[in-house]
């Protein structure tokens, strides 16, 4: 499947659908899009593909599909596997996506561990184009490779029911990028000045 299918939660969506249809095989990113290999009972792959095309993630755009019938390889489960970086076309890179309602809710919730965290994101939103260094789109090919996930972020990343399942830019105040405002002399403007958010700090400096 080619074009805008990386960085939109496509692989997690494929994984859930494949498991729901009782299929075995894998899904992985490639240089030109996403490769899916499915094996199952007669009719199951066709039903899976129809469901996939009917329920694409919000920001996914499919412009080309190539289907091949092959002999079963005997996979025992369905997995998201390591990307294939073999040259094979030019994929479409997504622009950065505005925070989704769920992420905004977390950022505004004092009980959330991402309260006021400006880099909150998930598979439905957050940075894409601005952090990509190479394709396929994997954390190791983005500027986020410098930030090792904390145990809690890693748990979300591995949880198939979590909206951050395989979200490549995932992070939090404990393990992700941070932001600070510096004066021209190098001194830092801290929250002690009566500001609750980085945005309020910046607005005060620019006023």
Locate each region found by the language model.
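Intrinsically disordered, low-complexity, mixed-charge
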Residues: 1-180, 189-196, 203-204
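Gly/serine-rich nucleotide phosphate-binding loop at the start of the catalytic core
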Residues: 185
